[in-house]
Amino acid sequence: MPLRLDIKRKLTARSDRVKSVDLHPTEPWMLASLYNGSVCVWNHETQTLVKTFEVCDLPVRAAKFVARKNWVVTGADDMQIRVFNYNTLERVHMFEAHSDYIRCIAVHPTQPFILTSSDDMLIKLWDWDKKWSCSQVFEGHTHYVMQIVINPKDNNQFASASLDRTIKVWQLGSSSPNFTLEGHEKGVNCIDYYSGGDKPYLISGADDRLVKIWDYQNKTCVQTLEGHAQNVSCASFHPELPIIITGSEDGTVRIWHSSTYRLESTLNYGMERVWCVASLRGSNNVALGYDEGSIIVKLGREEPAMSMDANGKIIWAKHSEVQQANLKAMGDTEIKDGERLPLAVKDMGSCEIYPQTIQHNPNGRFVVVCGDGEYIIYTAMALRNKSFGSAQEFAWAHDSSEYAIRESNSIVKIFKNFKEKKSFKPDFGAESIYGGFLLGVRSVNGLAFYDWENTELIRRIEIQPKHIFWSDSGELVCIATEESFFILKYLSEKVLAAQETHEGVTEDGIEDAFEVLGEIQEIVKTGLWVGDCFIYTSSVNRLNYYVGGEIVTIAHLDRTMYLLGYIPKDNRLYLGDKELNIVSYSLLVSVLEYQTAVMRRDFSMADKVLPTIPKEQRTRVAHFLEKQGFKQQALTVSTDPEHRFELALQLGELKIAYQLAVEAESEQKWKQLAELAISKCQFSLAQECLHHAQDYGGLLLLATASGNASMVNKLAEGAERDGKNNVAFMSYFLQGKLDACLELLIRTGRLPEAAFLARTYLPSQVSRVVKLWRENLSKVNQKAAESLADPTEYENLFPGLKEAFVVEEWVKETHADLWPAKQYPLVTPNEERNVMEEAKGFQPSRPTAQQEPDGKPASSPVIMASQTTHKEEKSLLELEVDLDNLELEDIDTTDINLDEDILDD
């Protein structure tokens, strides 16, 4: 069966002809040197051009990253080597390296060396620590030296390919080649070493359209690959996958199996001739250079072949080698979240196939290895072969002795105890299968669940799943798609009833088989269930768990990680990365058990589990309870004062909220509590809260609404003392203390407003205020100050002023007493009164003047409501206003509105 290899294009960068490509080891960058003399750096994640180097006007045939120095090294047809800092774009160094075009650059992985090859038939070694001096020259080729590559298993050895039809292997320190490989009929364009430890192989591609595999220890050609229709310009062993990549001037890239030499795939992106290829250890990305630009493709899946059983034994594949590690062997080693675990690795042997996936069965006794279209079931302890076969896919059932294979796109077979039990053809074909409590089969029509025992259709769902995860109880299942995931409840009792009675069974299965609990718009990469909690890694590298509609983030991961399993006794979750590093994160089983009990409404169990939850975790549990609607329990459980205060407000628990507000000493909390107290008619508590919050506006509202005159008076004094002039003014004004209002405006420099207030209510004070206004204004504008008219000097401009003096005195003598608030309905509103008419015939007991004889300002009268009563409404005097927790005070009933502009500070 063919190697299952997903190929996805990640980047297409249109440009001039690309002569070389390279991938950065840590950044998501591709380096491309162009025939027009430029070098470009592309970000293949954002698909943007991030850097450009204008090297020269001639073709740049070679360019490499030197990541440890932040360099880009280029070689061009002007025979110059140039070194650029890719962060600053500064040219660090430049020198003439050869006497003809420079074809290739190879960077030593550990030493400060680069090797260059040229059309001058020479290879040179340069040392950048010695001011880029030429340390050695390698002579021997009789034509252009097209490519050089350093042996990854022996960094002192390198190989070269030349148009003289030979491949030569060299040693640093020796100017002559170790040996020469001959076999191509035309010039050799490219060469590469196999990086695995099991084969001493070289690969070469030539103008004879052939690709040859060489054993450089035996110096023999072990395989010739035919298929390209034009010159082979690039050939490479992939450092991670068991594949060979070759590119040709025929415009195709061919992918071959490196063990069977079978052609697996042919890529043609229509960008004319292929010139170069680059890959990187630890990555599945491959860069390709063409006449019309460059492309990055992702080959295969980066998820490692790795599995862990319930006891903490981890098995993984490193290429074809299977290794094991045991978490128990760590003993009492201190483990920190997110740090790599220091595991002792044990080699278990080699696998006959290249493993793409490894998976334990539910009880952990067996492990299946899948790859190359085959599967092998081994014993987990000793890796002894138990069963094998051809299959495109494999899935374990919840019963550890049962499994299914997808033999083709139309046939699924079920095995029990390693013997075939049943074979069937799903109605709409089988593109993929999924294990668990039910056998899932994906087809073009959607997802179908079948019974393992009799392959009866349980339910067909119109969905295209990527992963399916079943809980241990079989009650819950997560179906993950490309864009979101669904949580479903499997109703096994209804399924059994429907199977017996055949009621509710349609062509799409049993209608009531599943109940949808929720859909979450997040992409699941890997996942597992612990109780009723679904733990998963997301596409944005977050480690989350979902329970009861709530998503809790356990950790933000710094790279892509894959879930292995959860060990309850350790209270830890284990994950692995593509480099086979194992990390873990703390996740308390008591928290998960509590949340599971709440979801099942088993509160007696939840109460038993609660004491085992550490205090630092209880707030997380309280948030969960709140989201489930159990706010009273959340208030009891939570240890976070902020959270408890919010819950107390929501529940109307005034005492608890008051205690928390006292402890917090927060103005915001006092304001929130005051609002709650008012809504509960607890006005004395509201008053105390507003005082703590220094909310003078709220206090004024409360005082006026309750008719509390003494409170208004105290508020006026306090507000003025604290600089809350608007509230102070309004408080004085409501009490009829117009003198205090006037003096407040004068003290705060609001002299125009003071003048208008005096003209309206205190005409006896107008002259004094105008003089103050004039003095103040003269400091800014003398002419404007002189234009102000004093009403006592220009009576003709202020008609009715003399009468106003009389009215002011009349009001003072006749309206000195306050009226009870309960008589408000009997008082004629100010807007309906004519004070001038009421004061007719009044003779003041003293002359109306601007000032008293001693020179002090005359005391201001207070304008009060009319004392006229109507006999027919006498019974209304008995009216009482019944307000809980309030004591009505005598207040001024003067209903006077003040222009808002006057109130602005």
Curated annotation (Swiss-Prot):
Residue ranges that the Swiss-Prot or TrEMBL entry lists as coiled coil: 867-891
Keyword Kinase: no
Each WD repeat, start to end: 13-52, 55-94, 97-136, 140-180, 183-224, 227-266, 350-388, 390-425, 746-783
Origin: domain of life: Eukaryota
A Pfam family it matches: WD40
Location of this chain's protein in the cell: Cytoplasm, Cytosol; Golgi apparatus membrane; Cytoplasmic vesicle, COPI-coated vesicle membrane
Region feature Disordered, mapped onto this chain: 837-873
Main location class: cytoplasm
N6-acetyllysine: residues bearing it: 627
Impact when changing residue 254 to C: No effect on protein abundance. Mice homozygous for that mutation do not display any developmental abnormality
Assembly information from the UniProt record: Oligomeric complex that consists of at least the alpha, beta, beta', gamma, delta, epsilon and zeta subunits. Probably interacts with PEX11A. Interacts with SCYL1. Interacts with JAGN1.
Protein's recorded name: Coatomer subunit beta'
Source organism per UniProt: Mus musculus (Mouse)
Organism phylogeny: Eukaryota, Metazoa, Chordata, Craniata, Vertebrata
